Amino acid sequence: QTQYYRNTISSLAGGININNIKKEHIENLQIPLCTMNQYLQYNMPGMDIPAIHYYGTDITWAEVFENTEKIARSLKALGCKEGDQVPSFLRSVPEFISLFLAAERVGASILCRMNSLKENVEAVASAGSHFMFAHDFLTVEEMNTFLSGTNVEKIILLPPCNSCDIEAMPDYVRNSLNENYTGECAHGPAIITWAEFLALGEN
């Protein structure tokens, strides 16, 4: 999988070997004149066209942008502002796309890490954020480690199947997903559900 991404990046970069970046490669980089949100809105095939197929659910471009706006409002309600880093441990789910775009609208950036717990905690601590995103299989032990080792006060939890039809998910994917639920799931006053998070932007 790693090699696939390397080949893809190399292809997008005009065949540049990302393991051997040279000075001229950096000098020739062009800074985009638009945001990712603007680029997608200019180039998407139509608002009613599905942008994401996610295990039995089609999510249109209109829904992507609508969800992006909702998340952006909720981020602002949590105090997120320009220059902030937003820690996210979400996997490849539709909500991550809208979260990424929403952070850009606010002027923030997404901090993604999938390392050891210790390394993840160090990265979140360095970001200085008082909230983070994770899936609902985050354990109580992991939650307490983040709360005690960082500035995080609130953790927004998202079920991986929030936007999918679970019956349309292949058994091997479902079994792999279930393997992530390894202990007592995080709960308590520091936890905000995804629905509660979205509701913050409605007030």
Show which residues each predicted segment covers.
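Conserved AMP-binding/adenylate-forming core of the ANL superfamily
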Residues: I31, I49-L101, K118-V121, A190-E196
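Short acidic/polar active-site loop segments enriched in Thr and Asp
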Residues: K81, H130, E153
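ANL superfamily adenylate-forming
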Residues: E142-N203
